[in-house]
Amino acid sequence: MTNYHVTLEAAWLVRDVETADDAIGVAISEAGKRLNPKKLDFVEVDVGTTYCPACSEPFGSVFIAANTALVGLVLEMKVFDAESDEHASRIAKSVIGKALTDVPLNVVDVEEFD
């Protein structure tokens, strides 16, 4: 059995915000509020990065229209004693998905560690 570090991305909708910084703060706070009661404080939450297709400059994954933001969050957790990287990603999606119901999740990266 092997240990894995699994990175997921989530699409988080935030209403009634005017700036990207406000949207990021609200999204991270709301995600934390939903993870902590489930004892998932070991899940790291951060804003994702998107790259400009024209100039390749990185920027925060936030899009705002009509005071509503779509924030791309990155969720990271360690999975211990998984049979494979596919198994580790299923475990991570299951654990995080139970706390963040109705939030789209996608596996971004799975890395083995000792």
Curated annotation (Swiss-Prot):
Pfam families: DUF555
Organism domain of life: Archaea
Family: Belongs to the UPF0212 family.
Full protein name: UPF0212 protein Mbur_0968
Organism listed in the record: Methanococcoides burtonii (strain DSM 6242 / NBRC 107633 / OCM 468 / ACE-M)
